[in-house]
Structures are given as C-alpha cells and as structure tokens.
C-alpha cells in the first residue's frame, strides 16, 4: 500500500512539474516616446503606466500586461513569443499619441506577432509644453516658476490647466509617488500661455523623508488638466541647493493660521 501511495505522489509531482515548466519570456519590446523627435518626459510612477499588452483567442483569459514607462519616456517589456495587441490604458491623457487615436470608447490597438525583439518608438503631442523651470528658496518656501505654452496641432482642443504641482525628492527619481508634494489652483482665466508659480514649505521636505539633513533637493513640476485626473504633464527633474538644516521661524506646521511674514519677537517678547 505504501508503495502505491508513493508511486501516486511521484506521478502527481511529475505531472505538476511538467505543467509548470513553461519557457521563460524571451522577446523584448522596447522603444521611446518622442515629441518633436526628442524624448518626451513622463511621470515615471509604476502605478501610472500608459501601455498595455493583451492576447486574444480561444481559451485565453488575459487581463493584460502593463508595460512600464520610465520618466525619460523609454519603455521595455519582456514577453513570451506570440501574438499580441498593444493599446493604452483606458483613461484620458494630457497628450495624444499619434499611433493610438482615441475613439468614442478607449483607444485603437496595434497588432504584433512577436517572434524576436522589437523596437518601436511612438510620437506624442502634449496639450502644453513646460519650459524654463527654476526654483529658489524664499523664506521657508521653495518657490518654482516655469513657462507654459499651449501646443497647436492636436486633434482635440486642449483642456484648461486646473492645478500646478511641485514634487520634491532626495534623488533624481521624482514622480507622482514622491511623498513631498504641494499643489496650487490655476486661475480659470489663465490662457494656457505664460508663467506659473507653485511653492512648497521646505520643512515638508525635512520631515517628509527620514533623517533628512540634506542641503539639496530634486524637484519636478506637473500640470493637471481639466477632467484628466489620472495622468499629469511633467517637467524635467532639477536640483535646488542651499536648503537650511534648521529653520528659526515658526511655521504653519505648528501654528494653524501662520502667514508670512511672521515676527517671532512680537509673539514671544523678552521676559
């Protein structure tokens, strides 16, 4: 009896191994998002990917394979060889990808029969350009200023800009996942061409990362467009230096109704 049980278990184990031993993915799909033949800068947050591979056919239940897009607009995905369709996540974006025109529902898809590595670039037209980004320390605030230009040539009118954001990080990897962020409403009368300003309390940078004694920070700004809450237009990543290790002033972290300028002496006179 024991021999029969052992033989039965061995047969089950062998069968399970036979089914589990699939070939590893061996085909690489890669490329670059381009705007005016230059790399298009993206969010870079892996929770906000753009592309989705899926397969169709009898017996296939495929929820899709997301392809991560880095902040520099490059992407690379390892796949099994086979037939795929590539499309975009079914959300609105602050740009148009020429190869994926938007329909009434969702986006078009592109068919690929992947038998070997494929390099495919895609061309983007954003609704707005961000340029001339610069940030300075003003009191306890990091103040970023940048220019915005509405882009012509899109198939749909550009939605208006509703919010500007600034993200701070301790390295070059700054995106919408970065924990230190501030946002500012954009005037509804803003035409889409001009300068915008967004600021953040520097103490949020100090307290937002553990044991953060750095005198520098990396930052990016982003634009949120009307009715497009899931993806933003991002700037390049830049660095600001000269951030004090300690702040002598009292800030809104401790005083609810704090507004600059604040005179410490007037509230705490000498005894």
Q: How would you describe each model-predicted region?
A:
Residues 57-74:
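Short, acidic Ser/Thr/Gly-rich low-complexity loop/linker segments typical of extracellular
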Residues 37-60, 157-162:
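Short, ordered, surface-exposed loop/turn motifs in non-cytosolic proteins
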Residues 105-135, 266-269:
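Extracellular beta-sheet/turn segments enriched in Thr/Pro/Gly and aliphatic residues
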Residues 1-6, 11-39:
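Bacterial Sec-dependent N-terminal signal peptides
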Residues 134-271:
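Ser/Thr/Gly/Pro-rich, low-complexity flexible regions
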Residues 73, 80-100:
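A short, solvent-exposed beta-strand micro-motif common in secreted/extracellular proteins
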Residues 91-121, 233-244:
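Structured interaction patches on ligand/partner-binding surfaces of diverse proteins
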Residues 73-77, 108, 118-120, 192-200:
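Short strand-edge motifs at loop-to-beta-strand transitions and within beta-strands
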């Amino acid at each position: 009896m024991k021999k029969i049980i052992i033989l039965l278990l061995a047969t089950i184990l062998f069968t399970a191994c036979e089914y589990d031993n699939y070939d590893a993915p061996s085909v690489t799909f890669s490329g670059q998002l381009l705007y005016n033949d230059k790399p298009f800068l993206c969010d870079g947050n892996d929770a906000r990917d753009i592309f989705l591979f899926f397969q169709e056919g009898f017996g296939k239940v495929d929820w899709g394979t997301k392809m991560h897009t880095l902040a520099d607009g490059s992407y690379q995905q390892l796949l099994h060889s086979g037939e795929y369709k590539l499309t975009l996540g079914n959300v609105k974006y602050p740009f148009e990808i020429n190869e994926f025109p938007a329909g009434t529902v969702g986006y078009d898809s592109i068919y690929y029969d992947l038998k070997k590595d494929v390099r495919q670039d895609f061309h983007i037209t954003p609704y707005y350009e961000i340029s001339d980004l610069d940030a300075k320390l003003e009191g306890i605030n990091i103040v970023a200023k940048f220019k915005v230009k509405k882009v012509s040539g899109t198939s749909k009118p550009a939605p208006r800009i509703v919010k500007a954001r600034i993200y701070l990080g301790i390295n070059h990897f700054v995106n919408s996942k970065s924990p230190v962020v501030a946002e500012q409403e954009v005037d509804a009368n803003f035409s889409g061409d001009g300068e915008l300003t967004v600021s953040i309390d520097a103490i949020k940078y100090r307290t937002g990362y553990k044991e953060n004694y750095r005198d520098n920070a990396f930052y990016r700004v982003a634009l949120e467009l009307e009715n497009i809450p899931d993806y933003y237009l991002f700037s390049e990543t830049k660095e600001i230096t000269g951030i004090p290790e300690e702040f002598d002033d009292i800030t809104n972290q401790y005083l609810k109704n704090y507004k600059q300028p604040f005179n410490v002496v007037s509230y705490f006179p000498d005894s």
